Amino acid sequence: MFAEGRIPLWIVGVIAGMGVIAVVGLFFYGAYAGLGSSM
């Protein structure tokens, strides 16, 4: 995949961080949207 044979750790951290932020954001957005629509 990569020329050096392994993925740099900072790239893994950035991708993992973005993924966590996206999942948490979607979770809270869905929760607030669900509560707002139910009320």
From Swiss-Prot:
GO-annotated biological processes: photosynthesis
Compartments in which it is found: Cellular thylakoid membrane
The organism's place on the tree of life at top rank: Bacteria
Keywords, comma-separated and alphabetical: Membrane, Photosynthesis, Photosystem II, Reaction center, Thylakoid, Transmembrane, Transmembrane helix
Organism listed in the record: Rippkaea orientalis (strain PCC 8801 / RF-1)
Entry's transmembrane regions: 7-27
Stated role: One of the components of the core complex of photosystem II (PSII). PSII is a light-driven water:plastoquinone oxidoreductase that uses light energy to abstract electrons from H(2)O, generating O(2) and a proton gradient subsequently used for ATP formation. It consists of a core antenna complex that captures photons, and an electron transfer chain that converts photonic excitation into a charge separation.
InterPro entries: PSII_PsbJ (IPR002682), PSII_PsbJ_sf (IPR037267)
Membrane association type: Single-pass membrane protein
Origin organism lineage: Bacteria, Bacillati, Cyanobacteriota, Cyanophyceae, Oscillatoriophycideae
Subunit text: PSII is composed of 1 copy each of membrane proteins PsbA, PsbB, PsbC, PsbD, PsbE, PsbF, PsbH, PsbI, PsbJ, PsbK, PsbL, PsbM, PsbT, PsbX, PsbY, PsbZ, Psb30/Ycf12, peripheral proteins PsbO, CyanoQ (PsbQ), PsbU, PsbV and a large number of cofactors. It forms dimeric complexes.
UniProt record similarity statement: Belongs to the PsbJ family.
GO CC annotation: photosystem II reaction center; plasma membrane-derived thylakoid membrane
UniProt-recorded name of the protein: Photosystem II reaction center protein J
